[in-house]
C-alpha cells in the first residue's frame, strides 16, 4: 500500500503529465494515450485510426519527444519527481 506522500507524488505527476499531453497536437496526443494509457499495439492503433503503422510510430516518436521537451521546459526530471520514466 502506498503511503500518503507517495500518493500525493503520484497525483502531482499525473496532473503534470495530463497538462503536458494537452500541449501536444491532437494526432500525437491520441497515439500516445492509446499506446501508453490504453496499452494498444502499434498495429491496433493503426487499425483504429485508419492510418499506417509507420504513421503511428512517427506520431508516437514525435509525441514522446514533445513530452520530454515540455517537461524539460517546466524543469521536471526523473530526479525532481523521484521516479524513473
Positions of predicted regions on the chain:
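Acidic, proline/glycine-rich intrinsically disordered inter-domain spacer in sigma factors
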Residues: 1-19
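Short helix-coil-helix linker/hinge
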Residues: 11, 21-28
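C-terminal edge and immediately downstream basic/flexible tail or linker adjoining helix-turn-helix-like DNA-binding
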Residues: 16, 47-50, 65-85
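Helix-turn-helix DNA-binding motif, specifically the short coil turn and the N-cap/start of the second
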Residues: 25, 41, 50-55
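Short, conserved catalytic or interaction motifs in soluble domains
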Residues: 26, 36-37
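A short pre-motif secondary-structure segment
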Residues: 31-35
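Residues within the DNA-recognition helix of helix-turn-helix
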Residues: 59-64
Amino acid at each position: 500500500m502506498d503511503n500518503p506522500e507517495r500518493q500525493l507524488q503520484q497525483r502531482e505527476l499525473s496532473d503534470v503529465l495530463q497538462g503536458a499531453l494537452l500541449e501536444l497536437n491532437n494526432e500525437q496526443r491520441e497515439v500516445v494515450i492509446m499506446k501508453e494509457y490504453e496499452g494498444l499495439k502499434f498495429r491496433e492503433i493503426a487499425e483504429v485510426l485508419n492510418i499506417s503503422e509507420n504513421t503511428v510510430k512517427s506520431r508516437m516518436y514525435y509525441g514522446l519527444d514533445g513530452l520530454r521537451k515540455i517537461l524539460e521546459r517546466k524543469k521536471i526530471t526523473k530526479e525532481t519527481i523521484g521516479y524513473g520514466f
